[in-house]
Amino acid sequence: MTDETTEILVAGANPYPVVIGRGLRFDLARHLGSAVSKVLVVHPPTLGAAAAELRESLAGQYEVLLTEVPDAEAAKRIEVASFLWCIMGQADFTRSDAVVGLGGGAVTDLAGFAAATWLRGVRLVQAPTTLLGMVDAAVGGKTGINTAEGKNLVGAFYAPAAVVCDLDMLISLGRNELLAGFAEVVKYGFIAEPEILDIIERDVDAATDPESAEFRRVVELSIGIKARVVGEDFTEQGLREILNYGHTLGHAIEHAERYQWRHGAAIAVGMVFAAELGRLSGRLSDDAVERHRRILASLTLPTSYPLGRWQTLLAAMQRDKKARGSLLRFIVLDDVARPTVLAGPDQSLLFAAYQEIAS
């Protein structure tokens, strides 16, 4: 275990650092800056004590307001966003104030959306406390909430001032929550960095130990890939689309299951579906498809979905924000680290891929 701090820059029109290390949640003032007066810390119920510690560390410099929101996807509702707007309005929040998202991906999505929309944008610092938040949700500048029609349909691209990843927060994270976050880590391995897959295959226990060098390595590799892609294509006009590997079906599963499935579990199944889609379209080898199943299963992530739900999933995918007009778009692989877009595949091909993952 190292105490060194790593800083990865997300380039672009509004560049920002992603800082990785230990004990960093007590160093947020450096990223909030001296011009800020009030700080709204948005956190879930499970992080009340951590939020109070954060308030104590900031109290000498800022007026700190702690606001508890529901856990997980229940936070990403218009009613909760409206609640945050009311809090900021009652506190006379101005453009010289700031929002901190302290929590998992759903909380940072919500906090980012509130910051992006209040007065058309106030300063935002993200402090993700889950693996999913660190390697994915908090890093890319996507913010948003869900609607009855689907996931993340209302939101904004909004760059934070910084993303602060305190690895110490992962030590006490529940095992299932940690492993669910590994779905996104595995995604990076398949679309861009085979070293991630090699580390997991070599020693899955070390790779998933938050205090190990192997764990830190896969986290830094994952964030580095996300930062590079987002820096080149912040608003998802081209390259960034590769980050959606496994997400078209994955988001449909989340919607079909009323968000009772963990995001990582849904994305794991979505990646196996995308791999089968690649194989059935003549792009990906049988061995590469089975490698998906083997690695995900080693992380106790699901690789199949119940039979008989296809029409529900198809309807959800057709409402997906990644679709272009009436055409569904899937990221598939020609090989490991060779992603490409499969646009408008025939529904018979999609159903055949679904049958391969149906249990």
Swiss-Prot record:
EC number: 4.2.3.4
GO terms, biological process: amino acid biosynthetic process; aromatic amino acid family biosynthetic process; chorismate biosynthetic process
Keywords, in A-Z order: Amino-acid biosynthesis, Aromatic amino acid biosynthesis, Cobalt, Cytoplasm, Lyase, Metal-binding, NAD, Nucleotide-binding, Zinc
Binding, Zn(2+): 184, 247, 263
CDD domains tied to this protein: DHQS
Residue positions binding NAD(+): 71-76, 105-109, 129-130, 142, 151
Protein family membership: Belongs to the sugar phosphate cyclases superfamily. Dehydroquinate synthase family.
Protein's UniProt name: 3-dehydroquinate synthase
Organism: Leifsonia xyli subsp. xyli (strain CTCB07)
